[in-house]
Design a protein with these regions (language model features):
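Flavin (FAD/FMN)-binding glycine-rich loop and adjacent Rossmann-like elements that form
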Residues: 1-218
Length: 218
């Protein structure tokens, strides 16, 4: 379960500090489930429904049936040769050096929670916007040349927080990972930096393995 406001320190925290954050999430989730099951302020029908749920008996048996790791939806991202933004996935969707086509909508979770009074709050930051197919350019997976010349980043790619929501799915990461492998072999073979490979040749190799680069090919 999301805990708006508590996620911000994670990326910069030590392992010990992350354990504290993890415990906060566990305590919050445990408390919320107990509240929904037992508190008289909760409608009786909802309490009855929630009373039917419990922890999975055959999972994480050595950890009180809780997952060992906190699910991290997003944390650090590279600032690369090109930063993919909300505009790139909504309006300026065509890119000359395209290496893959994204299509997922923007589904940003709540970022902050504000208390209105003793019984009410407002969540902020939620975006649920249907998108369109958009080009993902090569610069999104390459670092700035002055910082590194032999690195390709298909997962923690160079995107804004909003654009990251649209490429964070495994099918997209799988294709970007495959593209990274192709680009890496070209860089090694040509003894060049990853920024200096021939993107047109890369595109031909991408298409040769069955990854479409034109939206009409989907």
């Amino acid at each position: 379960l999301s805990m708006p406001g508590e996620q911000t320190p994670w990326a910069e925290s030590s392992f010990e500090e992350r354990e504290v954050i993890h415990k906060k999430y566990r305590d919050y989730t445990h408390g919320l489930l107990w509240f929904l099951k037992t508190d008289p302020r909760v409608p009786a029908g909802m309490r009855e429904d929630m009373a039917q749920y419990g922890f999975c008996k055959d999972e994480w048996q050595d950890n009180d049936h809780w997952p060992w790791y906190l699910y991290i939806r997003a944390a650090r991202r590279m600032q690369g040769e090109y930063i993919l933004t909300q505009a790139d996935v909504i309006t300026s969707t065509d890119k000359k050096n395209v290496i893959h086509i994204g299509s997922h909508y923007i589904d940003a979770h709540h970022v902050t929670r504000y208390a209105v009074d003793q019984d009410h709050y407002i969540n902020e930051g939620r975006i649920w916007q249907e998108g369109v197919p958009f080009d993902i350019p090569y610069g999104v997976i390459t670092p700035k040349s002055e910082e590194c010349e032999n690195l390709l980043v298909p997962v923690c790619a160079s995107t804004s927080a909003v654009a990251q929501c649209t490429i964070r799915l495994e099918p997209t990461w799988m294709h970007l990972g495959e593209v990274s492998g192709i680009a890496a072999t070209m860089s090694i073979k040509n003894q060049s930096s990853v920024q200096d490979i021939d993107v047109a040749e890369l595109q031909e190799r991408i298409k040769a393995v069955g990854i479409p680069l034109k939206q009409l090919s989907l």
